Curated annotation (Swiss-Prot):
Originating species: Renibacterium salmoninarum (strain ATCC 33209 / DSM 20767 / JCM 11484 / NBRC 15589 / NCIMB 2235)
Function according to Swiss-Prot or TrEMBL: Single strand-specific metallo-endoribonuclease involved in late-stage 70S ribosome quality control and in maturation of the 3' terminus of the 16S rRNA.
Class in the EC hierarchy, top level: hydrolase
GO biological process: rRNA processing
Record flagged with keyword Protein biosynthesis: no
Cofactor(s), names only, from the UniProt record: Zn(2+)
PANTHER family per UniProt: ENDORIBONUCLEASE YBEY, CHLOROPLASTIC
Protein name: Endoribonuclease YbeY
The entry's keywords: Cytoplasm, Endonuclease, Hydrolase, Metal-binding, Nuclease, Ribosome biogenesis, rRNA processing, Zinc
PROSITE patterns: UPF0054
GO CC entries: cytoplasm
Pfam families: YbeY (PF02130)
Length: 157
């Protein structure tokens, strides 16, 4: 499993934990061992540009996902094929604001956003109530299992 973190934010962050979480999610969702993922930690200005360019919305957001190969979770008997999962872009400054609002640590928020971004790359969405319940339920389940305690509550920018 190849997980690359590129920290362009200028903020020191727990990059190794993001890699460890990503590998954990890969295993839990039966992704091929040669699956590739890139996590980019961007400053507020860069994230705002991406948000406007790709989502046509002003202001920085917390996380954006850019899928490459259309990979989906596998099963025990049928793991997902190898491929390039895509890029997750996270804005640590927005994550810090959300962590404060949510009453949890910045590290917990970064782990939450990484999980959220991974699930988007795997085809999950939260546009309607059923999709949201499925995605957020899986997100909580994965994070709770990874952390060995309750996952932090979801926050929004």
């Amino acid at each position: 499993m190849s997980v690359e973190v590129n920290n362009e934010s200028g903020v020191e962050l727990p990059e190794a934990e993001l890699v460890r979480l990503s590998r954990f999610v890969f295993e839990k969702l039966y992704l091929h061992p040669q699956t590739e993922l890139s996590i980019i930690l961007a400053d507020r200005e860069a994230m705002e540009k991406l948000h406007v360019e790709w989502m046509y919305e002003p202001g920085a957001t917390d996380v954006l996902s850019f899928p490459m190969d259309e990979l989906r979770p596998g099963t025990v008997s049928r793991p997902a094929p190898a491929g390039l999962l895509g890029d997750i872009v996270i804005c640590p400054q927005v994550a810090q604001e959300q962590a404060q609002a949510g009453g949890h640590s910045v590290e917990d928020e970064l782990l939450l956003l990484t999980t959220h971004g991974l699930l988007h790359l795997l085809g999950y969405d939260h546009e309607d109530p059923e999709e949201k319940a499925e995605m957020f339920g899986l997100q909580r389940e994965l994070l709770t299992s990874f952390l060995g305690r309750d996952a932090p509550a979801e926050t929004t920018a």
